[in-house]
Amino acid sequence: MKPLHFAPLQGYTQHAYRSIHARHIGGVCSYYTPFIRYEKGGVRRKDMVDILPENNEGVPLVPQIIASGTDEFNYLCEAIQEKGYKRIDLNMGCPAPMQTKLGRGSALLSAPQIVEELARQMTQRPDVRFSVKMRLGWKQPDEWRHVLPILHELPLAHITMHPRIGIQQYKGEVDMEMFRAFYEECRHPLVYNGDLQTLDDLARIESEFPQLSGLMMGRGLLGNPFISAEYASGTEWHWADRRDVVLRMHDDWLQFCRQKYVSDSQVLLQIKPFWEYQKTWIEKKIYKQLMKSGSFRNYMTAIQRFSNQ
């Protein structure tokens, strides 16, 4: 069994969700924040609220940043260090056009000179242990060959590799042949990320790449929140146990939404994403009722039907 990391997903894995998952399920060595970015002269208030220590008690949290160059990088690091954090993850893998057009995320993989400048800045912050999340490249799957030697000069905690290129976004297949080449050359602890959905997926990657230092799941863990505990215990849960723990998570998430939002319609809008990725294990009819409910009353009726299954 390898340490399991929870990848961030914008709009889903904010502090309340992370805390609820850690409290009810666990099995995760590190939870990563959705990337924090420089925008309109500073950091968005909601991003700073998301990393406040009091909002993340009991959660092994790693703030993740995305930057196009040293100015943004240093601004973000300062803001995060002021909150007491000594771990920061640099996102060099995001494929979202809104970020890559600014030279951030996976676009950095085609600009090794900027990566080198960022690396120099990392060495100026000895109190922070950095990690890097990246892809094979931006436009070509061998662009990592120009970046990895730069990263080898740093005392990184680890590198997380998602074996696609940026312009693929999440389409097509992961390139496992090129991942193996990276795996064989990487001298840092290496974490695998990409298309991990099931316990069998985790076991397969662990078996094929035994020297990995960890595995990272994002959408797969959102869709099967209990899989981290199943993986840690080596035992697949019964369906009823899965349902019960997810309903406990849901109750806490509902309470959070009710405290934050006034109207039932606002609560309903915010709570539905909790289920969005979970259609693989929930009965199709129930899932549809949860997602299509037009009123809070109908939504709670669907929850009751689910709990009675």
Set out the residue ranges of the language-model regions.
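Alpha/beta catalytic cores of nucleotide-metabolism and tRNA/nucleoside-modifying enzymes
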Residues: 4, 10, 16, 117-120, ...
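Hydrophobic faces of well-ordered beta-strands that scaffold small-molecule active sites
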Residues: 4-7, 31-33, 61-65, 88, ...
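Glycine-rich, positively charged N-terminal anion/phosphate-binding segment
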Residues: 9-79
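Active-site beta-loop-alpha junctions enriched in small/polar residues
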Residues: 9-11, 36-38, 66-68, 93-95, ...
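Short, charged, surface-exposed secondary-structure boundary motifs
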Residues: 41-43, 169, 224-230
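Conserved phosphate-coordination/catalytic loops
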Residues: 67, 109, 113, 173, ...
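Alpha/beta enzyme core
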Residues: 77-88, 92-97, 102, 113-188
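Short glycine-enriched, charge-decorated loop/helix-capping segments at active-site entrances
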Residues: 103-109
